[in-house]
């Protein structure tokens, strides 16, 4: 790929009810975004990102993704990032997309490797709620932003509803199609009101189309982190509010994330981490080589080794 000729900064708008890419006139800021992406992607080109799963799992995963209309197949050649801005504005959206790892289901992400090395994933805890509260100069408190709504139950559904209410520019009288309200024993209207009650300090931000502006804020944080990891030649792979990085550099990533958020909001945010999987043991506790076991391991992952 010729990075100088590829357009990495894209602008979308809704036209006749359809999201479409639109042309735009360059500004110093769009040129900066593009140059930063060229820098990030040029570093990515020096590394190899892969998925270390057993051969028998490869076809299973491919079939699963094919059945899911919301996901794309995993194509390891899709190694570079693009920024997509929304609503015809370079102050809306701006998240980083099109890296193949963003299509990997959560339970498979532990097996993402960078330069054949095992990885860890770090993520911001409740990024959207924290940004919203800080934007209003309010403290969110220690209690989980989603669990507080239904006394700890149905957290995933509450999170979906919370984000839908922040994204919407209407009052959302009807439940969004992607939320399975039948899983809980209250109506959509009741859930909506409970979220508003639980988050009175930021109630004015719901139903105002705030979500795309918040996406721009988190995309600026992501850019900050990606530029730092590019400078240190230790690439990190973004998945919205989380990052995947080789395990030996993970502690550096955590500090980068804290600094990047603080530089944007002047406040701190919890960062959670997970050492995802441990490399296979080459030796027994007594020092005996695990030759037979490693031979089996190699055969089971031969497609990964062959790449």
Placement of each model-derived feature along the sequence:
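Helical catalytic core of nucleic-acid polymerases
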Residues: 94-208, 215
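A common structural junction motif
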Residues: 260-267
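Catalytic palm subdomain of template-directed nucleic-acid polymerases
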Residues: 244-257
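A generic structural motif
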Residues: 143-152, 267-278
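Non-catalytic nucleic-acid-binding interfaces of large nucleic-acid enzymes and RNP effectors
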Residues: 1-110, 116, 272-307
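Active-site palm subdomain of RNA-directed nucleic acid polymerases
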Residues: 220-239
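Catalytic palm active-site di-aspartate
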Residues: 123-124, 235-246
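Surface segments flanking catalytic/ligand-binding clefts of nucleic-acid enzymes
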Residues: 214-220
């Amino acid at each position: 790929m010729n990075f100088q000729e590829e357009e990495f900064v894209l602008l979308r708008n809704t036209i006749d009810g359809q999201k479409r890419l639109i042309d735009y006139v360059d500004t110093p800021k769009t040129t900066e975004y593009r140059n930063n992406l060229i820098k990030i992607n040029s570093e990515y080109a020096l590394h190899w990102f892969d998925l270390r799963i057993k051969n028998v799992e490869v076809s299973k995963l491919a079939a699963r993704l094919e059945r899911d209309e919301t996901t794309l197949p995993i194509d390891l050649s899709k190694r570079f990032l693009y920024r997509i801005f929304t609503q015809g504005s370079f102050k809306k959206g701006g998240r980083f997309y099109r890296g193949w790892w963003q299509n990997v289901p959560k339970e498979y992400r532990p097996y993402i490797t960078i330069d054949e090395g095992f990885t860890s994933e770090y993520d911001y805890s409740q990024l959207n709620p924290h940004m919203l509260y800080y934007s209003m100069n309010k403290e969110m408190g220690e209690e989980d932003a989603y669990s507080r709504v239904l006394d700890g139950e149905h957290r995933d559904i509450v999170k979906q509803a919370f984000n839908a209410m922040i994204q919407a520019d209407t009052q959302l009288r009807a439940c969004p199609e992607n939320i399975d309200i039948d899983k809980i024993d209250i109506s959509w209207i009741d859930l909506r009101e409970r979220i508003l009650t639980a988050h009175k300090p930021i109630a004015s931000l719901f139903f105002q189309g705030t979500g795309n502006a918040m996406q721009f804020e988190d995309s600026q944080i992501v850019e900050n982190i990606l530029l730092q990891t590019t400078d240190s030649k230790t690439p990190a792979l973004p998945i919205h509010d989380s990052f995947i990085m080789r395990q030996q550099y993970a502690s550096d990533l955590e500090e980068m994330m804290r600094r990047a958020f603080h530089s944007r909001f002047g406040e701190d945010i919890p960062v959670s981490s997970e050492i995802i999987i441990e490399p296979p043991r080459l030796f027994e506790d007594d020092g005996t080589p695990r030759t037979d076991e490693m031979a089996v391991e190699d055969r089971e992952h031969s497609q990964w080794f062959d790449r």
